[in-house]
Design a protein with these regions (language model features):
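Nucleotide-activated sugar donor-binding and catalytic core shared by glycosyltransferases
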Residues: 1-170
Length: 170
């Protein structure tokens, strides 16, 4: 909602909790925030997905490649708070630019390499949902600057290609 007031096209937000036991909790949080949403399992049953929503809640497992293939940009939620981050390599393989918070210790080298190659940006500043200033500013900047978004997307693909075959090298 914050972002939809600042860009011409209201972005569709896909929230995908890492753990299934959080699906109901996240649904409640979205509803409490006053946002219209559908669970992905309900949304696909709607003809042509034709429901006016702000958020699609990913409520099934094993579908991240599908979300990445449909995304213009990924915010790696597990890095915004001290949870250590998530695997950004899959997002990069789909050509998705990645926005990271400061907490990437579970994927520290991968995050540093992606940032260095221009596939990811680290957001610093206030990242709490109660005051997401830095996150909103960065999202708005990228969504309005398609050339930069495309540049990051190309860098994400290049990053993925450069990091293929790690098992063979070990």
């Amino acid at each position: 909602l914050l972002l939809s007031n600042t860009v011409e096209i209201a972005p569709l937000l896909c929230l995908v909790p890492r753990h299934p036991e959080r699906f109901a909790e996240v649904a409640d949080q979205i509803q409490d925030a006053g946002m219209k949403f559908r669970r992905r399992t309900e949304w696909i049953q709607t003809p042509k997905g034709g429901v006016d929503v702000d958020v699609i809640l990913g409520d099934s497992m094993g579908e991240m490649p599908m979300y990445y293939s449909a995304a213009d940009l990924v915010v790696m939620g597990g890095s915004l708070l001290p949870f250590g981050g998530q695997n950004l390599i899959e997002a990069c393989a789909a050509g998705c630019p990645v926005l990271l918070g400061e907490h990437t210790y579970n994927f520290q080298q991968a995050a540093l390499d992606a940032i260095e190659m221009g596939a990811a940006k680290r957001i610093k500043g206030k990242l709490l949902l109660s005051e997401p200033v830095a996150l909103m500013d960065t999202l708005k900047e990228l969504l309005l600057n398609t050339a930069e978004l495309e540049k990051m997307s190309s860098a994400a693909k290049a990053y993925s290609i450069e990091h293929q075959g790690a098992t063979k090298r070990i």
